[in-house]
Regions:
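C-terminal low-complexity, Ser/Thr- and acidic/Pro-rich disordered "stalk" regions positioned immediately N-terminal
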Residues: 380-416
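A cross-kingdom C-terminal cell-surface attachment/processing module
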Residues: 419-441
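Sec-dependent signal peptide cleavage junction
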Residues: 15-27, 412-420
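Surface-exposed loop/turn motifs in large extracellular/passenger domains
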Residues: 40, 57-70, 84-99, 106-126, ...
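Sec-dependent, cleavable N-terminal signal peptides
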Residues: 1-23, 443-444
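Extracellular, surface-exposed repeat/solenoid domains
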Residues: 290-302, 309, 356-379
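Disulfide-bonded cysteine-rich modules in secreted/extracellular proteins
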Residues: 26-37, 233, 309, 334-344, ...
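N-terminal extracellular ligand-recognition/capping segment immediately after the signal peptide
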Residues: 27-36, 40-61, 70-79, 207, ...
Length: 444
């Protein structure tokens, strides 16, 4: 029996080790240096392939699956995009799509085209953008979208020219969705004509660098459900049209805000930003959200922020301050309750909340004009303006007879129960009011 079990386990392990190679389509066509056009079917990149005939181009109407095999790298022909999609493209695998030329993208998704990214790293390994006014002689978006793109977990998009004397992107954005200037779309030498909006859905992945990590531009529609976004230059998300953020982690380690929102008009630059969830961290003293003017306010219904965002909280949505020096702001009833339940002190700065299962020792401070219940107790009003601390429970006492005799000939003592207090480490970033950015949007 033991031998049979060992054999079965060995077979299971072998299947697991082979599963990656089995995932490769044996009928897939190998992409070579001279491959230029992809028609219906499956293709695979193995090893390092530098294109010589031009961009790897998906034909209009074609349904193509492109696998980036482990360790593979697809590099552009000088002066060309690496991949141009005019059809329906799905990319899988763990390899890399790179672009090393000025003004060229690793992936260019044309108007009307659809791309689904299920894996791979997309890079500009010679990115040299030095500042908003200096492209360093080699800069562009890593991905440019005029069609529809869905990004799923397992994808990495970056601008990392540091190994080649470059930068992580300070001139061009990393991922651009929509038109830079839709008023000139379709004109000779300009961006393609606008027939339908550019749609970008991000379900996960890692996005690093760029002047703006994700730029939602003219006629762009952006939805972010999850992902990790890091920026050191300007903003993690820059929006001028329609953006909905439902989750993800966003970090800005430079001297600007995590999010930026601006409205230009009611047609293609609506400046509509809705934030339902996510964690947004800027440097100490830097606002998490910056807006161009009062017409550009986002609508915040959830999330955790490193600065005060109550001015953007939709309607009566509650907001609480917590963490060291109350530098973290939590938005939404359920999120605030979770923080207090985890053992954090909170100050309710806006709205009405009902907190339940808050452990002993936690202090809740009701702000002016708020209505706050803690474990069923109404602490609203001036009586608790300095805070209400949840008292220790009287505990539960029960007697259990025992015949056990201890070494000192005494019986076992009664037992008591004391609910412990969970510890939670909050964000420790100091909030600061944002300075409105009123200049015309920088290229990218």
């Amino acid at each position: 029996m033991k031998k049979a079990l060992a054999t079965i386990l060995a077979l299971v392990m072998a299947i697991g080790l082979c599963s990656v190679s089995w995932a490769t389509d044996p009928a897939a066509t190998q992409v070579t240096e001279t491959t230029e056009v992809l028609d219906n079917g499956s293709y695979i990149v193995n090893g390092e392939v530098t294109l010589t005939g031009g961009a790897l181009t998906v034909k209009p109407g074609a349904a193509v699956t492109l696998e980036l095999a482990a360790g593979s790298k697809l590099t552009n022909k000088a002066g060309s995009h690496t991949i141009i999609n005019n059809g329906n493209l799905t990319i899988t695998g763990t390899g890399t799509v790179d672009n090393v030329s000025h003004g060229c993208a690793a992936l260019y998704n044309a108007p009307g085209a659809t791309a689904t990214l299920n894996g791979g790293t997309f890079d500009r390994s010679h990115e040299a953008g030095a500042s908003t006014g200096n492209n360093g002689g080699n800069s562009y978006y890593t991905i440019k979208n005029f069609g529809t793109i869905t990004v799923n977990p397992g994808v990495t998009v970056q601008q990392d020219g540091t190994a080649n004397g470059g930068t992580t992107g300070k001139y061009s954005s990393l991922f651009a969705n929509g038109w830079y200037d839709i008023t000139t779309a379709g004109q000779p030498g300009k961006e393609p004509a606008h027939s339908s909006d550019a749609v970008l859905v991000i379900n996960g992945g890692t996005f690093k660098g760029g002047l703006n990590t994700v730029k939602n531009d003219d006629a762009g529609k952006l939805t972010i459900n999850d992902g990790t976004f890091t920026n050191i230059a300007q903003h993690a998300v820059f929006n001028v049209n329609e953006a909905t953020i439902k989750g993800g982690n966003y970090t800005m380690s430079g001297n600007d805000s995590v999010l930026y929102n601006r409205k230009y008009d009611d047609a293609n630059d609506k400046g509509q930003m809705t934030i339902e969830n996510g964690v947004f961290k800027a440097k100490d003293g830097v606002p998490a959200i910056k807006i161009a003017d009062e017409n550009s306010k986002p609508s915040v219904t959830g999330g955790t922020f490193s600065s005060d965002v109550r001015a953007y909280a939709a309607g009566d949505t509650p907001v609480a301050a917590t963490g060291e020096q109350e530098g973290t702001y939590v938005v939404g009833q359920s999120a605030i309750n979770a923080v207090a339940k985890a053992g954090n002190n909170v100050r309710i700065v806006k709205g009405n909340v009902t907190l339940t299962d808050v452990p002993a020792g936690v202090t809740v401070i009701p702000g002016e004009g708020t209505v706050v219940f803690v474990n069923g107790k109404d602490i609203s009003g001036n009586q608790y303006s300095d805070g209400y601390t949840v008292p220790q429970s009287s505990g539960y006492y029960y007697y259990q007879p025992t015949t056990d005799t201890k070494t000192d000939n005494t019986k076992g003592s009664p037992k008591t129960f004391d609910a412990g207090i969970a510890l939670y480490v909050g964000m420790a970033l100091t909030s600061a009011a944002g300075v409105a950015f009123v200049g015309k949007k920088r290229e990218d």
